[in-house]
Design a protein with these regions (language model features):
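A short helix->loop->beta-strand "cap" motif at the edges of active sites that frequently abuts
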Residues: 27-29, 219-223, 284
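Electropositive, gly/pro-rich neighborhoods at or near active sites that engage anionic ligands
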Residues: 36-171
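Charged helix-capping and loop-helix junction motifs
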Residues: 206-213
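Short, flexible loop segments at boundaries between secondary-structure elements
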Residues: 38-39, 219-236, 291-294
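Active-site glycine-rich loop that binds ribose-phosphate moieties when present
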Residues: 166-186
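Short internal beta-strands
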Residues: 32-36, 222-229, 265-270
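C-terminal functional extensions of proteins
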Residues: 236-309
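Extreme N-terminal starter segment of soluble prokaryotic enzymes
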Residues: 2-6
Length: 309
């Protein structure tokens, strides 16, 4: 069987940037994206899927690349009006973005799965890649803090990831099952790429689903991860803080340990070349290049490097 597609496990801004580069290097229809749903939440009675939307908007070239989320040229008049009635406004729902959440909630209400809903909606906005939720079952990332347990969006957006983190759990992951489409995508892939996403809250919820992790262990494809860290700091977001809270070394070596049971290669930044020896002893190959993606051209170069491994 000829393996022609590339599978990317994705969540967050780093993944969105990388995918913008990947589709410049390979045909977009040959890209399958398995996306985190641990960030999903409910706001104003609407089903919100932040990572799925960021990936879809990026591939459709509609993402606000300055903020890193939402639609470009967005307005917030509905949000401003909702505040008048006392509705929570800490999660900034844009006017056109609101249509996405309304449509998704309606399709789910009609009985479509999340996978079916995402397929319909991504096609409608011109995305040629296959975007797959990691599961159709509810999996939610929970952050335990001294003040109580928070949903990820409460921790990340409302609290601006300031509280101390005691633990991270994935509610529903033990019962969740990946769709056949996700499992086949991983098993039959030409190459599996772990995007430079937060290993705890973007990739972690997917790996907590047992059959996803099993598929990664069993696939005949090479599995390559791109580090979301340079040195001991995250390129963006709370990855370093969350890794430390979960007992991982805050370094590319710590990222490799998150994926140690299925990873073949990890891509480190040139500034971390000296760390290669601390990873290679674990039989994981180390590749070195510039992993920062300030623009689409840099993302293209990184994608070209990764698929050439």
């Amino acid at each position: 069987m000829t393996r022609t597609h590339y599978t990317v496990l994705a969540g967050g801004t780093g993944a969105a940037k990388f995918l913008r580069g990947l589709v410049q290097v390979v045909p977009e229809e040959d890209v399958h994206v398995v996306v985190n749903v641990g960030d999903d939440t409910e706001i104003w009675g609407l089903h919100i899927s932040p990572d799925i939307d960021s990936i879809a908007y990026a591939l459709a070239k509609r993402l606000d690349t300055v903020r890193g989320w939402g639609l470009e040229n967005e307005t917030f008049r509905c949000l401003e009006e909702a505040q008048t009635y006392g509705l929570p406004s800490w999660f900034r729902l844009g006017d056109r973005d609101l249509a996405t959440h309304l449509a998704r909630t309606e399709f789910l209400r009609r009985g479509l799965t999340l996978t079916g809903t995402v397929a319909h909606m991504t096609k409608a906005i011109g995305v040629k890649a296959r975007v797959l939720p990691a599961t159709d079952d509810p999996v939610r990332t929970k952050i335990e803090t001294p003040g109580g347990v928070l949903d990820f969006q409460e921790f990340f957006v409302r609290e601006r990831w300031q509280p101390q983190v005691r633990s991270v759990t994935y509610a529903g992951a033990n019962e969740a099952r990946a769709s056949a489409a996700v499992l086949n995508s991983i098993r039959e892939s030409k190459l599996v790429i772990i995007a430079p996403s937060n290993p705890i809250t973007s990739i972690g919820p997917m790996l907590a689903i047992q059959d996803v992790r099993d598929a990664l262990r069993c696939t005949r494809a090479e599995v390559v991860a791109i580090s979301p860290l340079i040195g001991h700091a995250a390129i963006s977001g709370p990855a370093a803080k969350l890794m430390e809270a979960c007992g991982y070394e805050v370094s590319p070596a710590g990222v490799a340990r998150c994926y140690h049971d299925f990873l073949d290669n990890i891509v480190l930044d040139t500034r971390d070349a000296a760390l290669a020896g601390s990873i290679r002893y674990e039989t994981i190959g180390v590749q070195i290049t510039d992993i920062l993606m300030p623009d689409d051209e840099a993302a293209r170069r990184l994608a070209e490097f990764v698929i050439g491994i």
